[in-house]
Amino acid sequence: MLYNLLLPHIHNSHIANLFHYITFRGGLAIIITLSLSFITGPILIEFLRSLQKNGQPIRSDGPESHQTKVGTPTMGGIMIILSSCLSTLLLADLTNKYIWITLFGFISFGIIGFMDDYAKVTKDNHYGVRGKSKLLLQGIISFIICVLLEYLDKSPSHLLNVPFFKNLSLDLGYCYIVFAIFVIVGSSNAVNLTDGLDGLATVPIAFTAGSFALISYLVGNLIYSNYLQLTYIPNTGELTVLCAGLVGSCLGFLWFNAQPAEVFMGDTGSLSLGGVLGIISVITKHEIVLAIVGGLFVIETASVILQVYYFKATKGKRIFKMAPLHHHFEKHGWAESKVVIRFWIISVIFALIGLSSLKLR
């Protein structure tokens, strides 16, 4: 909004001219979302605590240390969604189609997560909305997003770019839509599975969002994209502002989510954040890079899939003491803080590997 209001005055005002730069607006988005989180966090947490008598239900079969979390309110993802959306509406170009499509997906996945959290809190169990129902809703929203991208792009690309290789891409044709839906839904649920310990998912999400802030900027810049031999996609640079807002809102949320957590982001936060990262990767044509940068989410998801498959195949045997993987290490006696920090380190490594693909070809 501010960008659109100040745009006519960029040649007459130094301040207005600053808003012409995506990097300036991205930095400002981080400051705004951090500030909003610090200001609204205590108010929202107290409000959620007053509404949720018992807080988020804690699994009885989980690590014993988790019983100390009883009574902690959930739905803290509302803080992340509100601050990110507000900063984006203030600082991004509101004539940009990618901004509106991404915000639509972000909020829609947040609503699904809210429904799930609400069901858990009201029923006082950790099951929530049926898994198939959530997948169906996620699939419908992802399909709508893919159709919008197809319709609004004059010449939509169905190419899947392979990182670390020059000029290597796969033309998926209209199967790309199915693939894109898989990426968005998969990303949403992968982040959801990772969000099992205080602060565990928040920092890797910030790393991933920060990585895609850079990717969006480069892909949307003709000079940089040509230099790095990336697929140039006009107008994607504005997503840098949104990604920067995600970084700031996640760091602001971490202030309250660090162990011992005062609030959980819940499915409201994890499903929406995973979904929006998937959407941005599809728009920027860096779907495989998302799997690399967000490698921690992939590993956590793979551990659940392997556990379930092996359990069914062997009629009761398990590969891990408990899935997702972070619970396995807790069952091995690792302190929660040690698991979280070590997983953060792994996330940094994956982010660096993913970003190196922009240059190493």
UniProtKB/Swiss-Prot annotation:
Alphabetical list of InterPro entries matching this protein: Glycosyl_transferase_4, PNAcMuramoyl-5peptid_Trfase, PNAcMuramoyl-5peptid_Trfase_CS
Molecular-function GO terms, alphabetical: metal ion binding; phospho-N-acetylmuramoyl-pentapeptide-transferase activity; UDP-N-acetylmuramoyl-L-alanyl-D-glutamyl-meso-2,6-diaminopimelyl-D-alanyl-D-alanine:undecaprenyl-phosphate transferase activity
Keywords assigned by UniProt, alphabetized: Cell cycle, Cell division, Cell inner membrane, Cell membrane, Cell shape, Cell wall biogenesis/degradation, Magnesium, Membrane, Metal-binding, Peptidoglycan synthesis, Transferase, Transmembrane, Transmembrane helix
Cofactor: Mg(2+)
Pathway: Cell wall biogenesis; peptidoglycan biosynthesis
Membrane-spanning residues: 28-48, 74-94, 99-119, 133-153, 168-188, 203-223, 236-256, 263-283, 288-308, 338-358
Compartments (UniProt record): Cell inner membrane
Pfam family membership, one: Glycos_transf_4
Main location: membrane
Described function: Catalyzes the initial step of the lipid cycle reactions in the biosynthesis of the cell wall peptidoglycan: transfers peptidoglycan precursor phospho-MurNAc-pentapeptide from UDP-MurNAc-pentapeptide onto the lipid carrier undecaprenyl phosphate, yielding undecaprenyl-pyrophosphoryl-MurNAc-pentapeptide, known as lipid I.
Family: Belongs to the glycosyltransferase 4 family. MraY subfamily.
Full protein name: Phospho-N-acetylmuramoyl-pentapeptide-transferase
Source taxonomy: Bacteria, Pseudomonadati, Pseudomonadota, Alphaproteobacteria, Rickettsiales
